[in-house]
Amino acid sequence: MTPNKEDYLKCIYEIGIDLHKITNKEIAARMQVSPPAVTEMIKRMKSENLILKDKECGYLLTDLGLKLVSELYRKHRLIEVFLVHHLDYTSDQIHEEAEVLEHTVSDLFVERLDKLLGFPKTCPHGGTIPAKGELLVEINNLPLADIKEAGSYRLTRVHDSFDILSYLDKHSLHIGDSFQVKQFDGFSNTFTILSKNEDLQVNMDIAKQLYVEKIN
């Protein structure tokens, strides 16, 4: 499979997490390609039984498509762990490197890497690393945006975008850190959280990309 097709598969998977319906327009925007290019790729992927058309959701990954996406995430996240633990990369540097390397490493390399790293369960951003042959099921899947009550929470996963990681680094908020959700302002769609004695205003766009767990 070509790297381009692999990127399309990941894109469709990620849109399906964020939005109710996956459209050609949204795929084109995220992939930064023309709508005709998306149409052509969609035809190929449908013919290869990677995706199927769905009236409500736009497109759905087939079992084969989800299997391939899971393998890609496994490669990507193991590479991220290696870069942080063995090459002293920071968490905001690893995503782009892993994006390139995930398309080039062999299955044997990934197996050896997994063993070298001690079979890690999560990547530096808190994302689940599926075991060999298993489908990706995120362990940390409660977004801050869905929190309904004030209280103590722990940051368990973040989307690995440069802007989000830079925002968290600026405020010294990292995976595993605890913080207080003080209130939610429905008018401005903003959470007020207390982290390390600092009040932070977190808008809904950011809150959708931060995953948490309640601390009892």
Task: List where the protein language model places each region.
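Mid-protein regulatory/catalytic core that forms ligand/cofactor-binding pockets
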Residues: 102-209
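Alpha-helical residues within the helix-turn-helix
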Residues: 29, 46-47
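Short, hydrophobic-biased segments on the C-terminal half of alpha helices
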Residues: 42-43
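Key DNA-contact positions within bacterial/archaeal DNA-binding proteins
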Residues: 36, 92
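Short acidic, hydrophobic short linear motifs in intrinsically disordered regions
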Residues: 18-26
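A short, conserved structural fragment
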Residues: 47-54
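Basic, amphipathic "hinge/linker" alpha-helix immediately C-terminal to the N-terminal HTH DNA-binding motif
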Residues: 57-76
